[in-house]
């Protein structure tokens, strides 16, 4: 058989042309050390900051330190099976979590994996956990309220949709209680809630979930849990994951509320990671970028304009503005608000609700210090009726606290001072509220109205709360039309004021409290 050289070359050419070879180019390196969930890797030349890395056993990590001859990464999850010499591959992806309405009513971890035993989440979309906050042009000023249902907050420290309001205080003084009451009060108000639990005991998180289930609040709530037993990496990532889940609703013209409970634990977790990565420590051993840790998170809470929503949804949603309201929680040590993390977060947020252990122990709950607590933008969002009635309350309380300090030393007080002290005692009593019992707008309005117009002045202090409760029941049965008008208009007309005066006089005459 004679072979023609031209035939051979044609045959080889056709074979080469028909060859389909696809090369999957992936950079890989070698683990050189593993310490407390922190891995040093040699040989990853083109890895990105924040890129996902693939380890053996379907384990992933996050590249945080890019050094000249090595990469420092943090493992997401278990790391006991990773050892020196293991191969690490780059993925070319950044960390994403599932987002969407499928997450509502579920309890998930910091990576969006369900941990409530109710099966898979089946979310259709995922989104990056680190995102740039909307620019100034796309934002709108805060103008709609978030009703917490707590008398002292809604009257003196109002919160608006798109605001960042800090809840700050020592341990065990009611910070989580304020946050949970706010979630419970959103029933039927078209507000999706996200509760991010960071570094808490698993039993405490379970109690919160159970209470939300009992009150029917879990139907519109997502719980993101990174308990104390989880790695520092998960506690560091949980707030960003929760924020991304909230942004899904904000960017589609809906309203969402996110609670970070608490950011002190996140700062501790980040400090631990940074020290293990051998980053230089600064004040209180925190790394230099701990301010940026919280600012880039809290700046993502905003009220965005109709144009932003329309642009984001490619014209599917028109004429609707969206909002993400943030209530970060910070735990102080012995009331020290001048520590590093508290001062950082106070400067980032639009106001703070300051809770005091002394007030809590004195039975004044919620233990809000009216003098130090402030809402810088919430006043514009306060409902008309509450704004009209709450001005006097704050002044009364502030003057009462001032006078009460002097009255300890003064033996004989003039009539005006004595009256002011008596009024202050009754207002303080009126603002007390049991946990898990948030009030509607009309109930708050009626309480403030009775205090402002002197209907509590001749009552014993111990009778103030029974009087308030009895008054609400009386109005429900005898003046349902008045309640409906206040609730619908969120205002108090002259006729309604006259009707309320008459109702209060009748109720007081009856003595049914």
UniProtKB/Swiss-Prot annotation:
Cited function: Produces ATP from ADP in the presence of a proton gradient across the membrane. The alpha chain is a regulatory subunit.
Keywords: ATP synthesis, ATP-binding, Cell inner membrane, Cell membrane, CF(1), Hydrogen ion transport, Ion transport, Membrane, Nucleotide-binding, Translocase, Transport
Protein name: ATP synthase subunit alpha 1
Domain of life: Bacteria
Residues noted as binding ATP in the record, renumbered to the chain: 169-176
Family in the record: Belongs to the ATPase alpha/beta chains family.
Catalytic reactions of this protein: ATP + H2O + 4 H(+)(in) = ADP + phosphate + 5 H(+)(out)
Claim: ATP-binding is one of the keywords in the record: yes
Assembly: F-type ATPases have 2 components, CF(1) - the catalytic core - and CF(0) - the membrane proton channel. CF(1) has five subunits: alpha(3), beta(3), gamma(1), delta(1), epsilon(1). CF(0) has three main subunits: a(1), b(2) and c(9-12). The alpha and beta chains form an alternating ring which encloses part of the gamma chain. CF(1) is attached to CF(0) by a central stalk formed by the gamma and epsilon chains, while a peripheral stalk is formed by the delta and b chains.
Subcellular location field: Cell inner membrane
Pfam families: ATP-synt_ab, ATP-synt_ab_C, ATP-synt_ab_N
Residues flagged as site, Required for activity: 373
A single GO molecular function term of this UniProt record: proton-transporting ATP synthase activity, rotational mechanism
GO cellular component: plasma membrane; proton-transporting ATP synthase complex
SUPFAM superfamilies given in the database record: C-terminal domain of alpha and beta subunits of F1 ATP synthase, N-terminal domain of alpha and beta subunits of F1 ATP synthase, P-loop containing nucleoside triphosphate hydrolases
EC number: 7.1.2.2
């Amino acid at each position: 058989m004679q072979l023609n050289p031209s035939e051979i070359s044609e045959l080889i050419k056709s074979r080469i042309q028909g060859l389909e070879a696809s090369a999957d180019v992936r950079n890989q390196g070698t683990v050189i050390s593993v310490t407390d969930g922190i891995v040093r890797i040699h040989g990853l030349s083109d890895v990105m900051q924040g890129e996902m890395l693939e380890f053996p056993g379907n384990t992933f990590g996050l590249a945080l330190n890019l050094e000249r001859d090595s990469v420092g990464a943090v493992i997401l999850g278990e790391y006991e099976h990773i050892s020196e010499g293991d191969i690490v591959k780059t993925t070319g992806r950044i960390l994403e979590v599932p987002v969407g309405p499928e997450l509502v009513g579920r309890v998930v971890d910091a990576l969006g994996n369900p941990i409530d035993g109710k099966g898979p989440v089946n979310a259709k979309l995922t989104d990056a956990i680190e995102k740039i906050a909307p620019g100034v042009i796309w934002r709108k000023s805060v103008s709609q309220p978030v009703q917490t249902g707590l008398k002292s907050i809604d009257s003196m420290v109002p919160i608006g949709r798109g605001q960042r309001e800090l809840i700050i205080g020592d341990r065990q003084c009611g910070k989580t209680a304020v946050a949970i009451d706010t979630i419970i009060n959103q029933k039927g108000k078209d507000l999706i809630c996200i509760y991010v639990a960071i570094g808490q005991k698993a039993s405490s998180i379970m109690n919160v979930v159970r209470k939300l289930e009992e009150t029917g609040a879990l139907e519109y709530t997502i719980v993101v849990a990174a308990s104390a037993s989880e790695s520092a990496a998960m506690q560091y990532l949980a707030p960003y994951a929760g924020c991304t889940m909230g942004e899904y609703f904000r960017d589609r013209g809906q309203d969402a509320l996110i609670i970070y409970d608490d950011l002190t634990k996140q700062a501790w977790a980040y400090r631990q990671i940074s020290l293990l990565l051998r980053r230089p420590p600064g004040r209180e051993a925190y790394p230099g970028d701990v301010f940026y840790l919280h600012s880039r998170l809290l700046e993502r809470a905003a009220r965005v304009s109709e144009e932003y929503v329309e642009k984001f949804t490619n014209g599917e949603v028109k004429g609707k503005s969206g909002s993400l309201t943030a209530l970060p929680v910070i735990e102080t040590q012995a009331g020290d608000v001048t520590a590093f993390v508290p001062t950082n977060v106070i400067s980032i947020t639009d106001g703070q609700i300051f809770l005091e252990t002394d007030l809590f122990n004195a039975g004044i709950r919620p233990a809000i210090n009216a003098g130090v607590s402030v809402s810088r933008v919430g006043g514009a969002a306060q409902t008309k009726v509450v704004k009209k009635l709450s001005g006097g309350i704050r002044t009364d309380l502030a003057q009462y606290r001032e006078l009460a300090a002097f009255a300890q030393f003064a033996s004989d007080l003039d009539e005006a001072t004595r009256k002011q002290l008596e009024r202050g005692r009754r207002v303080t009593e009126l603002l007390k509220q049991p946990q898990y019992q948030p009030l509607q707008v009309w109930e708050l309005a009626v309480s403030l109205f009775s205090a402002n117009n002197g209907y509590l002045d001749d009552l014993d202090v111990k009778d103030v709360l029974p009087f308030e409760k009895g008054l609400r029941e009386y109005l429900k049965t005898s003046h349902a039309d008045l309640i409906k008008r206040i609730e619908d208009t969120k205002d108090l007309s002259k006729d309604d004021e006259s009707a309320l005066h008459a109702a209060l006089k009748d109720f007081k005459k009856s003595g049914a409290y």
